[in-house]
């Protein structure tokens, strides 16, 4: 009989929003498309708020409320960057519902976003979801084209 006491669960990052899944290489911003911040995927949101894609701890909330960093329970660090050039909105269009240091669970609401305002006042409402410490591990990105918040696994880690 083999015991799996020490076998770690594989990381599963679920979609934080509903929308179209886009390869990171197609995000119209070189910081993301050239993977300067790490491996990942992007979602063009169709509706709704932004929810936690993993169980973990909030480690960063941008002062302009457009980005949230989460450390998953396995140590993987995930950045949700809501929109492109949204730092210039100075927090307008965003209401963050968590604080740095909060323990969060998959599916917990972390941000309300005014998609109409963001669409009119920023370059894009696309959400890059980046593993900022991806050099340490290997990840498998989904081949799905559409994301269902809380259900579609978009990134799997080893």
Q: What residue spans do the PLM features occupy?
A:
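Contiguous, well-folded functional domains in the mature portion of proteins
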Residues: 1-158
């Amino acid at each position: 009989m083999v015991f799996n006491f020490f076998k770690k669960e594989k990381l599963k990052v679920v979609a934080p929003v509903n929308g179209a899944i886009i390869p990171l290489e197609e995000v119209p911003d070189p910081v993301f498309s050239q993977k300067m911040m790490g491996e990942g995927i992007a979602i063009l949101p169709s509706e709704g708020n932004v929810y936690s894609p993993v169980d973990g701890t909030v480690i960063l909330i941008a002062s302009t409320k457009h980005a949230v960093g989460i450390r998953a329970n396995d140590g993987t660090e995930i950045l949700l960057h809501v929109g492109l050039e949204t730092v210039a909105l100075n927090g307008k269009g965003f209401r963050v519902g968590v604080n740095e240091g909060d323990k969060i669970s998959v599916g917990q609401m972390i941000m309300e976003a005014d998609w109409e305002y963001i669409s009119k006042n920023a370059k894009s409402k696309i959400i890059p979801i980046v593993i900022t410490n991806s050099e340490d591990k290997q990840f498998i990105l989904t081949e799905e084209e559409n994301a269902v918040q809380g259900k579609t696994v978009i990134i799997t880690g080893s």
